[in-house]
Curated annotation (Swiss-Prot):
GO biological process, one term: dipeptide transport
Origin: domain of life: Bacteria
Species this chain originates from: Haemophilus influenzae (strain ATCC 51907 / DSM 11121 / KW20 / Rd)
Protein name (Swiss-Prot/TrEMBL): Heme-binding protein A
An example Gene Ontology molecular-function term: peptide transmembrane transporter activity
Amino acid sequence: MKLKATLTLAAATLVLAACDQSSSANKSTAQTEAKSSSNNTFVYCTAKAPLGFSPALIIEGTSYNASSQQVYNRLVEFKKGSTDIEPALAESWEISDDGLSYTFHLRKGVKFHTTKEFTPTRDFNADDVVFSFQRQLDPNHPYHNVSKGTYPYFKAMKFPELLKSVEKVDDNTIRITLNKTDATFLASLGMDFISIYSAEYADSMLKAGKPETLDSRPVGTGPFVFVDYKTDQAIQYVAHENYWKGRTPLDRLVISIVPDATTRYAKLQAGTCDLILFPNVADLAKMKTDPKVQLLEQKGLNVAYIAFNTEKAPFDNVKVRQALNYAVDKKAIIEAVYQGAGTSAKNPLPPTIWSYNDEIQDYPYDPEKAKQLLAEAGYPNGFETDFWIQPVIRASNPNPKRMAELIMADWAKIGVKTNPVTYEWADYRKRAKEGELTAGIFGWSGDNGDPDNFLSPLLGSSNIGNSNMARFNNSEFDALLNEAIGLTNKEERAKLYKQAQVIVHNQAPWIPVAHSVGFAPLSPRVKGYVQSPFGYDAFYGVSVDGK
């Protein structure tokens, strides 16, 4: 999740560390793009810089695209274009009859990357798995506080409470024991936050007195080797020659940071970008008939929403929250912001996920009803509040600024005056998590195909101070989630999640606004690229004709 949310401000300095250690031998972004049409280099043009390169420390899609999706592997991974898992660093596994013990048999002969910082002396083994879990789990682990890590997704998925032990049985076997059964556990192991690091690399950097290098100069087992990051310009990778699945067809991968959507499109047409992220929705119709563009699309596993801080007046009053739901014209937002690339939302879950409750009736656009509820709540003349505007484009929201303009105008019609507020992305999320938020725009993309991956991180009370931006605290809702996650019967789980969605609808800690359609504009020469339902981009197996 994807929130895919964010890194702390302190951890964001790791990006600068990566830049400081850049090799002077690397080419500039412009030189790299110019070479795109003549060598075996794939150029991926994204909208913003990553917040880091260490998947344990982050919870944000752009950063996962730059780290875990290219550099790392996990015990299990999701099949291309699917929410189904398949073996990865674990070749096979057994689950005990009580559902509490998982024994993983690790793949042999897997090679870590060789970089200028590190030359591995052994293959991947159980020590690397233990390190990757224990760093996040054990407060006394020597790496737990390195890079000021807070492990937001590890906590959002309740792994500190879930995991009883992670034990090395032998070099090629790991046993993970849970404190309680969890129907989502195996799928969760395919998520980016639990990517597998090199324990040997970590140890060597610790002994050298620079442990933060583990996080700023990533070393994994994945298909691409990290080479260099030029801040706010480009990230460069080369193919991992000894990748366990077989070498990728590409020699080099470049993630080029191009903030302007129009410029990204122009570069795609010119052949200096092979795939662009976050196209301008106004350009989609043209792209569909452009011979220089191959446009893929997929319904998104995401939601864009307005979160109310339910601990702060007036948003601690359910009638106020319901009133603001009635006051928003979602149809106008879909037309103006998504322009055919999205559908209106009524639940925190997207309709593409099982257990979606389609029987719930959305709050219709009804300003008069909104005024009535405000009067009943003690605000007959409305009120004044700050409104936070998400500062970046995300998979769930192509234009947060325009969305905010429409919502603020709608609220003004019922007497609610809004003062627009925004911050840099890392600061925006940090302040919201700390409880400064009044009301504001957020988004989330699913990471494992399970409804719990939306409901628990975003609305579970245990995630207040982390990914529950609304600070929603409802014991009945929590009880339903806790019961559902302990069941293995999918139909029984679905019934509970549908009940949970009713509670969210009635209590209105959010305005669920929209679910986007994911578009991938790429060069017609690109082969082997498959859209992920989670909104991530991985380039193993991708090739470009003529390169």
